[in-house]
From Swiss-Prot:
Domain of life: Bacteria
Molecular functions (GO terms): electron transfer activity; iron ion binding
Pfam families: Rubredoxin
Primary site of residence: cytoplasm
Biased composition (Basic residues): 97-109
PROSITE patterns given in the database record: RUBREDOXIN (PS00202), RUBREDOXIN_LIKE (PS50903)
Cofactor(s) demanded: Fe(3+)
Function noted in UniProt: Involved in the hydrocarbon hydroxylating system, which transfers electrons from NADH to rubredoxin reductase and then through rubredoxin to alkane 1 monooxygenase.
Similarity comment: Belongs to the rubredoxin family.
This protein's encoding gene: alkG
Full protein name: Rubredoxin-2
Annotated GO CC locations: cytoplasm
């Protein structure tokens, strides 16, 4: 079984682990993934852009740097990779810059819960594609009832539009 890496965000698809959230159970080979599939973290790169980083039982050459293995549930490194483009001309950099520009403290809606305490609802925006999660509305198609706070969503949840991780969401103001 092999591992394939997105050249933009360094997400790694591991055939052994699969990616159940994307519908690929453990053991799903790279060849069976549809050609139109895109990186679930950045949605910028298509399957054809991925590079093989580990194949079968082959091990990296001695003395060679071993790439960070990051799966759908592992957050990215904080520091930038020297091989990644950091210019604002890349599509993912443009998308993230636009979303971060909008990332201001959210004007909150509020309501009282069953105990009489005031609950403040906020909106969260995906920095990759701009999807907005509104706590007041929830997302019934994802199984989150109205009033479900973002912090109560499981950590392995991904953006329903682009597949980005929960860590790729920031507070949003209308």
């Amino acid at each position: 079984m092999a591992k394939y890496q997105c050249p933009d965000c360094e997400y790694i698809y591991d055939e052994v682990a699969g990616h159940p959230h994307e519908g690929f159970p453990p053991g799903t080979s790279w060849e069976t993934i549809p050609e139109e599939w895109a990186c679930p973290d950045c949605a910028v790169r298509d399957k054809a852009d991925f590079v093989v980083i580990e194949s079968g039982s082959a091990s990296p050459a001695s003395g060679a740097a071993t790439p960070e293995v990051r799966t759908a549930t592992t957050p990215p490194k904080a520091e930038a990779s020297p091989q990644k483009s950091t210019g604002a001309s890349t599509p993912s950099a443009n998308n993230k810059a636009k979303a971060k520009a909008k990332a201001k403290p959210a004007r909150a809606k509020s309501s009282k819960d069953s105990t009489g305490k005031e609950t403040t609802f906020r909106k969260w925006i995906c920095i990759t594609c701009g999807h907005i999660y509104d706590e007041a509305l929830g997302d019934e198609t994802e199984g989150f009832a109205p009033g479900t706070l973002f912090e109560d969503i499981p950590d392995d949840w991904c953006c329903p539009d682009c597949g980005a991780t929960k860590e790729d969401y920031v507070l949003h103001e209308d």
